[in-house]
Amino acid sequence: MDNLRKLNLLSVSLTIIFVSLTIATNLPFFEVKYPNNNPFGMLLRPTPIKNQSLGLPAHVGSDECRVWTKACSDEILRLTYQPDNVAWLKRVRRTIHENPELAFEEYETSRLIRSELDRMGIMYRYPLAKTGIRAWIGSGGPPFVAVRADMDALPIQEAVEWEHISKVAGKMHACGHDAHVTMLLGAAHILKAREHLLKGTVVLLFQPAEEAGNGAKNMIEDGALDDVEAIFAVHVSHIHPTGVIGSRSGPLLAGCGIFRAVITSEDSRGAANLLLAASSAVISLQGIVSREASPLDSQVVSVTSFDGGHSLDVAPDTVVLGGTFRAFSNSSFYYLKKRIQEVLMDQVGVFGCQATVNFFEKQNAIYPPTTNNDATYNHLKKVTIDLLGDSHFTLAPQMMGAEDFAFYSEIIPAAFYFIGIRNEELGSVHIAHSPHFMIDEDSLPVGAAVHAAVAERYLNDKHS
């Protein structure tokens, strides 16, 4: 037993010496593993130096970039536009596009991401929110800044005829989340090569179920924002020309909610009043915005569904109506929610009827407005202009679309921005959620570079 213990201790000592020499001589690193949690039975598994397959050395970047200059931005662009790197970005995006997965079903997408992170030597935690990933690059200490990408596809049959069309019937990446994942992996590749320059930690969040509305909330509940002090994210835009970044300070995307009202009458003779009561309620709902909202504060209430039965000679015993509401501030948004319930219940009450209103809050169907913090927006704008030039940054208009990135922006300073994919020659002009939606892949390296520069420079600025 004593001889065996001495032999094991000798093995440990030799391992430590070997690893030390490996690091000192910059030889391929050997990863230490402990089988069965036994420190006296270590195995050595050779691991190649990361990033070599894409033509990047393990560490890239001058120490002069510890104080940011235009040369540092140019260095990131040079790394991004290496031919092997651009080709890799396209391969990754096309693989994800061919294999779309719906909310909380992104198992193969997540597997691909983890495979790429493993290849780059990037640490991560998995799973969060069922299929999500929290990876990190840098010192491992504060400050922590996050960049997020969503992973899920939509239940849409792709109508674009091209070599890499969706292989899954009835499912399609029709909102660009395949590009979002690719851009964040591209940023990870750049940041890993420049890890020795990072004055803190960059957190990479790969999030499921943006389209379902509760992916972000579940990620937060599972610790995605632990220690994080600011967060950034991008979304492709068919409005902006390829490679142009658009954003604005303050509210950028609207808060969005849905509602459904079931109208009934306890009086059997009141059935004839149900349609009249419901119709009156619809008209009154339209008056909330036109009569109560400021014309300078954009709000929307729309009734989009009305079911009053199908028989032509029998009055219904129930009428169901529903719709959506949107606003750019929390105060206006929740005022609309309150007034919708009041108007529905009071208006049908005039006709002796009752209304039960459901806002589907338990199903996470309410998104708050997505609001950009002034400081994070200004940081994004400064970094983008230094990286790409004045012509590649534009003030984006407020949009009535909604995004569950809003849940992050409610907790910490955030900046959400658009990257242009519009290219009329390619036919990349269709709105998201269209079966004809496609992107100009020239946007991929731009998004990767902006992500990387925004994150690295955020850490730099915190220490300046």
From Swiss-Prot:
Extract one GO BP annotation from the record. regulation of systemic acquired resistance
PANTHER family (UniProt xref): IAA-AMINO ACID HYDROLASE ILR1-LIKE 6 (PTHR11014:SF62), PEPTIDASE M20 FAMILY MEMBER (PTHR11014)
Q: What does this protein do?
A: Hydrolyzes certain amino acid conjugates of the plant growth regulator indole-3-acetic acid (IAA). Also hydrolyzes amino acid conjugates of jasmonic acid and 12-hydroxy jasmonic acid.
Q: Name one GO molecular function term.
A: metal ion binding
Q: Does the keyword Hydrolase apply?
A: yes
The entry's family comment says: Belongs to the peptidase M20 family.
Q: Looking at the record's lineage, which domain of life comes first? A: Eukaryota
Q: What is this protein called?
A: IAA-amino acid hydrolase ILR1-like 6
Q: Which Pfam families match?
A: Peptidase_M20
Species the sequence originates in: Arabidopsis thaliana (Mouse-ear cress)
